[in-house]
Amino acid sequence: MSRLRNSAQLQLSKKESLGDNGGALNTTRSSRQKQGKYGFTRKCGRLVKEQRARFYIMRRCVVMLICWTDHNNNNSDHS
């Protein structure tokens, strides 16, 4: 008896989460194809942004180390 109640509650919660019109079940084929294409574009864009940020950080670190090394070498020459 409790299993029937749980399954009925589970089915009710699924219907509630999808809404009255079925939600994602009414997605047309063309909109699914667009989502796939734009999803790929978004993923690529995100990866490009991430790699650009990593490259920027690495470049800043290298410049900082070069400047720090030059500064230390200049100070040791005078001592």
UniProtKB/Swiss-Prot annotation:
Record key words, sorted: Cell membrane, Developmental protein, Glycoprotein, Membrane, Transmembrane, Transmembrane helix
Coiled coil: none
Keyword Cell membrane: yes
Region called Disordered, residue ranges: 1-37
Membrane topology: Single-pass membrane protein
UniProt GO cellular component terms: plasma membrane
Origin superkingdom: Eukaryota
BP GO annotations: negative regulation of cell population proliferation; shoot system development
Glycosylation sites: 26, 74
Ranges of Polar residues composition bias in the record: 1-12
Residue segments, region Required for DVL/RTFL small polypeptide activity: 39-70
Matching InterPro entries: DVL (IPR012552), DVL_RTFL_regulatory (IPR051525)
UniProt cross-references to Pfam families, sorted A to Z: DVL
UniProt-annotated location(s): Cell membrane
Function text: Small polypeptide acting as a regulatory molecule which coordinates cellular responses required for differentiation, growth and development, probably by restricting polar cell proliferation in lateral organs and coordinating socket cell recruitment and differentiation at trichome sites.
Similarity comment: family membership: Belongs to the DVL/RTFL small polypeptides family.
Name the UniProt record assigns to this protein: Small polypeptide DEVIL 8
Organism: Arabidopsis thaliana (Mouse-ear cress)
Higher taxonomy: Eukaryota, Viridiplantae, Streptophyta, Embryophyta, Tracheophyta
